[in-house]
Amino acid sequence: MSQSGENVSPHERTFPVERVQIGARMEKNMVKVLKALAEYFDISLGDLLEGIVLHAFAQKHPFGEETLKRIAQLKEVYGMGYDASASHRFIEQATTEERG
């Protein structure tokens, strides 16, 4: 029986979707942390972001204590020295290539 059937537990059910490529720009060190976290879970970056968004939309925390500790380590390794209070306050800077 297909996992999208009704006799499957909610955690085993699958959802057919159509994915699209997006051209989003994000802060460089945040992307490094997200990529490392996706690699840690052995999932794609897109899958990780989808999970974070779905949890946020449902007003749930996407990560447990163990993962939050891992994120703190990754933030330190990749120089992500800010938290949620920086939301919507980033100022775009010219890249090294753009400065000449």
Residue ranges of each PLM-predicted region?
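Intrinsically disordered, low-complexity regions of eukaryotic proteins
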Residues: 14, 29, 52, 99-100
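Short, positively charged interaction helices/loops
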Residues: 58-100
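Amphipathic alpha-helical interface surfaces
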Residues: 30-33, 45, 70
